Amino acid sequence: KRCVAIPGDKLEIIDGLLYINNELSKLPYRAKPLFKYRVTSQNGISSKELLKLNITGFSRKFKISGINSNQQFEAIRPYISSLISSDIENFIITSGHKGIPSRIIAENRLRVTEIKEREKIISMTNSDFEKLESKKTFDSIYRIFKTTKSYNTSFFPNDIMYDWNEDNFGPIIIPQKGQEIELNKQTLP
């Protein structure tokens, strides 16, 4: 976390980008904000290829055959992000970018096949995006952000009157000494 505005500034987030006093904020060179991208490929997206590029903000989908005991399930449980199908013959899970360790697969005599998805949502930095785009192996890569106006009580001022979210927020004015605000139904959050 860092200070991005000072008293008297107007702060606003538009399409995931920070604006201070109506100007796009220039982040320090060390700042590496993550954005969500939708990546598509008719040939499927290789997790191994993403990992070679040191891109890790994605999930993987696996089909697991041969699960016939609680012991096997308990062995892979720590690596499961979500369970898509619990059918013994068609057991499908998602995991983090590291997947399921080969040692766990071998010890439990599981048959694990990664499902090569045609679309992935990937969290990555601008430099990761440039690396991925330069590969020319994907049909499309585009940044996604919340554009629909729907209120979210997780975000200040936690009021249905404001349709703010993590990608579109504000504007708000950072109070400064001596500033006066008329208190009424519109100015009280």
Identify the role of each PLM range.
Residues K1-P189:
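Soluble "head" domains of membrane/secretory-pathway proteins
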